[in-house]
Amino acid sequence: MTKYIFVTGGVVSSLGKGISASSLGRLLKNRGLKVTMQKFDPYINIDPGTMNPYQHGEVYVTDDGTEADLDLGHYERIVDVRTSKYSNVTTGKIYQEVLDKERRGDYHGATVQVIPHITDMIKKKIMRAALTTDSDVIISEIGGTVGDIESTPFMEAIRQMRREVGEENVMYIHCTLVPYLHAAHEMKTKPTQHSVAELRSIGIQPNMLVLRAEKPIAQELKNKISTFTDVPVDRIIESIDAPSLFDLPLAFQAQGMDQKVCDFLHLESPKPEADMEAWKKLDERAKNLKNETTITLVGKYVELEDAYISVTDALQHAGYLYDTKIKVNKVQAEDITEDNIAEIMKDSDGLIVPGGFGTRGLEGMITSIKYAREHDIPFLGICLGMQMASVEFARNVLGLKDANSAEANPDTKNNIIDIMADKRDEENIGGTLRLGLYPATLKKGTKTREAYDDQDVIQERHRHRYEFNNEYREAFEKAGMVFSGVSPDNHLVEIIEIPNKKFFIAAQYHPEFLSRPQRPEGLFKAFIGAASGLPAQHFN
């Protein structure tokens, strides 16, 4: 029987529910259990695909092409699992499916209501995740905080789950904040008490608390919280601010969190405890890096940390392999000119231009790529970065001064990057991209193929509607550009590289989505190797 763990939050948002859920997931996985992660987002958008990155952060893409919340990236990187369309559910998706059923007459004339129709659909999504993965444990994070109007249907649905699958198969974990008042030199438990009271008022009694705090919480305060919340004191877990993300699973294990979860759910794991030795080595390496490598990231959304979180994490993963800390210098593409690019790049060991949409900042990207190419600075382009690298090469090597992307200038004579043929007649923006995992065939004797350990074919995740215009392939190849990765039918250019440079590779796909702390993705690994000039130093 699948066990269901529901992770909720209170007091404030951004408590780290996703990291806490992922850390528990990692511990359970390392005990030999099959774990599936799931996120419920209470916004009415169908998915975050059309949302402004400044509001929502990065859009994460799964193997099956789901545009999802960035928390799925945390799940995949920390737990080391693959997520799917069943892993991210929004209010918009729920209402869309319910209304579609109503239009088809599936409800046979019944009045469609939040209870039972919306809550039943939410429960169906939870159950479907279990059925399609055959998991031992489903960990579902409920977005927002308890008491939010938007989250109410989700809270009601998970309350009902306890009755439907049996109380021995459901556990509620509530994450709260225990603030420290510096003026009074004391920690306050009242916000946690009120948050749990709010949760209990809707019929959910938490079985475990995760307390976010600046510093360790005194035992007497834990006893007080236990008294007011009816949560046994041994199931009150601390989540103390830590210098490294990798500390949290180890801190949870030290407090016996995974064992307490297994005991509560009567869950027998194949291993008596989580084997975290490799994780400890990773944590030790991450805290004691001996070198530093500076990478300039030129992008459109650099003011928001979360906008490129998978990219910056992937850079760090590669850094661990080379025992080097990656210092990421983020630069707004719009601010770059021919006059200041030398100053911007003077201390950089490498340049990365990640994905994005729209016309803003494109000329700044092109200027930075030109500088990297001409000065042989290692360069990695991703999605839009690959497209702008192609435009830069056309302008400054082929001499096609009006070369551009059809996205930036549909009327240009030399549209090096054109909209994909099957996307030309699309009127909607959302859900109309080339999304998900697709294969690419790698050319022998290239740096790209070497980066992927001489594999013939790789599978990578995509999110784009524009592609390299094949009419220019021959001219590019004659000028020295190599198409080192293409689709199996040779129609779509996936990867370009300039072989006589130290490292100049750009990919149409998003390699950052498949990077893991203990397994850096191939292009990132090769890029940081070239930028740092250091030998790989394996620690696992």
Curated annotation (Swiss-Prot):
CTP binds at residues 13, 148-150, 188-193, 224. Its EC number is 6.3.4.2. Mg(2+) binds at residues 71, 141. ATP binds at residues 14-19, 71. Residues 1-267 are annotated as: Amidoligase domain. GO terms for cellular component: cytosol. Keywords: ATP-binding, Glutamine amidotransferase, Ligase, Magnesium, Metal-binding, Nucleotide-binding, Pyrimidine biosynthesis. It holds the Pfam family CTP_synth_N. Pathway: Pyrimidine metabolism; CTP biosynthesis via de novo pathway; CTP from UDP: step 2/2. HAMAP family: PyrG. Homotetramer. Catalyzes the ATP-dependent amination of UTP to CTP with either L-glutamine or ammonia as the source of nitrogen. Regulates intracellular CTP levels through interactions with the four ribonucleotide triphosphates. This is CTP synthase. It comes from Lactobacillus johnsonii (strain CNCM I-12250 / La1 / NCC 533). The gene is pyrG.
